[in-house]
Amino acid sequence: YLIEDKKQFRSYCDTNEILYIQEKLPIDRDMRIIYVGDEVIASYWRIGGENSFKNNVAQGGVISYDNIPQDALALVDKVAKELGINHAGFDIAEVDGHYYIFEFNVFFGTRGLLNQSIKLHEIILSYLQKQTPSIPTDPYTPFPKVS
């Protein structure tokens, strides 16, 4: 949803409990970089349709596998490792040589994998099998236990 003035912004705020807001960047494409385990397994450009600011394939964008910047792949690798992410699709834009991570999400679209013969489910399963301990362990508790 593109907001172009204060009136539209107020209307958006009045009708949405949760706001997802980002600056509109001067781009006609962004990258989807898929990370599983401890590596990038796929990457591609999502190029917006004519007269659209949206690049996602589900809303008319097209896919290109040409010339994905190595710096963007390295950025995803670094961020994923620093944050302990082992499965996500990263959406990244490049503006004037700077990279902007819009989001990373475990529920990412995979249409860009169809032409690459990448079987995501097999890669995820292989990673999980390598990570599975041979003996049962206690589940990780992210918050202190309250007695």
Residue positions per predicted region:
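Active-site nucleotide/adenylate-binding loops and adjacent lid/helix of ATP-dependent enzymes
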Residues: 1-28, 70, 74
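Short, hinge-like loop/turn segments at secondary-structure boundaries
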Residues: 3-6, 38-39, 107
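Short gly/pro-enriched beta-turn/loop segments at secondary-structure junctions
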Residues: 14-16, 26-30, 34-39, 85
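Beta-strand scaffold of nucleotide-dependent catalytic cores
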Residues: 22, 31-47, 100-105
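Glycine-rich, positively charged active-site loop/lid region within alpha/beta enzyme cores that binds
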Residues: 39-64
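C-terminal active-site "lid" helix and adjoining low-complexity regulatory extension at the edge
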Residues: 67, 81, 85, 94-147
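A conserved acidic, glycine/proline-rich C-terminal tail/linker
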Residues: 76-79
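Hydrophobic residue at the +6 position relative to the catalytic HRD Asp in the kinase catalytic loop
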Residues: 90-92
